[in-house]
Amino acid sequence: MKRRVVVTGLGAVTPIGNDVESFWNGVKEGKVGIGPITRFDTTGYKATLAAELKDFVAKDRMDPRTARRMEPFSQYAVVAALEAVENAGLKMEEEDPYMVG
């Protein structure tokens, strides 16, 4: 049996856009997501540039209590996945959980 994978929805949390629309607009405009590190003092480090997310507020896009219990990278993944599910028009309660994901 040959299995197929079908991409039906997109989600993005990136240094040039925190959703698919702003990410794609950033790509088309030639935006660069790399800049000076702002999350901590880089004095004493060789690296001073990074691709940091800007203006990302997890509690605006997912349950605030859940967001508080997650590391930032997990928040990024969950928010992107939620956007992809929404973008696909999936209603998970109507789907077989063993067939989608």
Question: Where does each model-flagged region fall?
Answer:
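Conserved "HGTGT" condensation-loop signature of ketosynthase/thiolase-family condensing enzymes
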Residues: 1-101
